[in-house]
């Protein structure tokens, strides 16, 4: 899970 101001660049849905 990502808890940042923006989604990760290398995200895998």
From Swiss-Prot:
Upper lineage is: Eukaryota, Metazoa, Ecdysozoa, Arthropoda, Hexapoda
Q: Which organism is it from?
A: Microplitis ocellatae
Q: What is this protein called?
A: MP1 protein
Q: In which tissues is it expressed?
A: Salivary glands.
């Amino acid at each position: 899970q990502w808890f940042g101001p923006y989604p990760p660049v290398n995200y895998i849905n």
